Each structure stands twice: as C-alpha cells, then as structure tokens.
C-alpha cells in the first residue's frame, strides 16, 4: 500500500471514530408515554460515520460530472419513507446509552480525502462496516465537489469483492447521511445508476463553508426544529442543551463538526431565520427560548418534521397523537390557503380575459 493511501485510511478512520461516538450518544432525558405531550426529540446518531465537506446551493443536470448538489427537496415523499435498517436505534429510549464525549480524543475533524481511482488496488481490505464508513466519507466528498456518484465507482472503489452486498452498504450509508447530516441520497439516473445528495425536508440550508474541514449542519438544525415542535412549539435553552449535551455538544466548547455550537444555534440559525431566540415572558432571572423562524415555517412543515422524528424513533407519526393532530391541522390550513390562492389567480385571469375581449368588441 502506498504512503498516501495509508494516510488517507488513517485520516478517515480518525474522523469516522469521532462521528461514531457522536451518533451513538442519545439524549439522557426520559420519555413518557409516546402520545403524551410534549415529547423530546433527541436524534440518535447511531452507526453513522464519516468526514465532511462543503456544498454550494445551485442545481444543474442531475447526472453531469460537475453536478451541483444542493438542495431543496420540495414535495418529495421519499424524505419520510420508513427506515429498514435494523441497526438504527431509537433516540427516545429512556434507557439511552451514554458514551464518552468527542472531546476525549481532542480531534477537531479532518478533511475528506478523495479515494484515488488509479490506486484503488492499494486500498486496505475492509469489513462491510468499514466499507459503510468509507462510503459515507466518499458521499461527503462528492457533496463537497458537487458531483454525483455512480454505482460503478462505488463498486470499484469501495464495495469491490462484496458485490452482492452493494445495496446493504448503500442503504446503511444513506441512513447515516440522513440522520447525522440531514442529507438524502437519491438515484437521479436509473439507467446509469447515478446518485445525488439532497437536503432533507424541503430545507435549503446546509451551513457549509468554503474549506475542506466544513461539515453539513442540516442534521443539527432538523434536530432542534424537532425538539422545538415536540416540546410544544417552544423550547427553552436548557431543554435544547439537555438534548445536545449527551451527544457531546456543549455550549462554549468547540465541537469538531459544529464549531461553537451556541454561536451556531443562537447566531447563525437565528440569522438564517430558521429559529427565533426570544426572552421568556415574566422570567426572573431572564431566560430565553427558541421557536421556529419564518424560513423554517416557509420551507418545511410540522408534518415533515414529525415524520422524520417518527422515522428516527422507528415508529409512526400517529404514535405522537397530539403533535400528529396539530400537524394535520396545519396541512389542512396550507391546502385551503393554496386552493384559495389558486381560485383568486384564476378569477383574476378570467377577469383580465373578459376585459380584453370587451375591448376588442368595442373596436
């Protein structure tokens, strides 16, 4: 094996180890009966590994070699399809296992290193779990360079002798991309079997920076939107950190994926209008809470977030009865609003046509 391949494997393993610790950690808050309100969403970042990269926001032809992978995943029901992986654990478990914090390793992340296609024979022999880890890393690299992935490349570089387990490896890697990073992996060219990455739930934000150490932040954003909704459409700072601390994410402590988490949540998510950060009325000393911002309300919905929560929980949205009923009401209101807007538009168009016909007849 060449020295460059050894370094690549070492860097990948280091970051994968850190991400595994993050995903295994679950919130240490007890969950009561599933349909009681409010519930706390705590994303189980279980069995998810990898290194990350950066992204831009434009979309081009889905299978071009320089494909730009952004994206808003508008009106795609595939976002909420049920998980089929048996190793995706429930994040709401009251007996959530605790793990060591990421800071124990003092790793601040390492860049995604692309596999060298010409030197693929020098890659180390990997277990199936290792190949899942490596594929997640490869997916994030492709997200960074705005390219699609082909089945042929994945087979050649990663799956290799485990050809009969391709779909298992792809599925497990895709679930980790979804649960940790808020990204969906979808086949965009069924003929050539090309896959692209899309931001989940209709959101258009991933928080990527223009450097090789940048990680997608959408997974954390979805987690917090879920906490806010499940806690009754408002969550105190304390409630947010009760979810994040068991995952090794602490206010004022630099995280290898998220940098300064408090700054990210309180400044960037608020600035991007996904959250509003406001004082709690009549609190003494003053306390603060988070609610959904205008952009979150415009881009996604309570039903989409609830379906994601249920999927992570390995359950059905109807299990969370009060939240499900609330989400249904919002869906009905949105549908009614759209119908009224369409009716107004049709009426205006009809009046315009009538006026035009009248003018012609007068001439």
Curated annotation (Swiss-Prot):
The gene is Mageb16. Signal peptide: none annotated. This is Melanoma-associated antigen B16. Residues 33-124, 342-363 are annotated as: Disordered. Residues 128-327 form the MAGE domain. Pfam families: MAGE. It comes from the Eukaryota. Keywords: Tumor antigen. The lineage of its organism: Eukaryota, Metazoa, Chordata, Craniata, Vertebrata. The keyword Transferase does not apply. Gene3D superfamilies: MAGE homology domain, winged helix WH1 motif, MAGE homology domain, winged helix WH2 motif. Residues 82-97 have a biased composition (Low complexity).
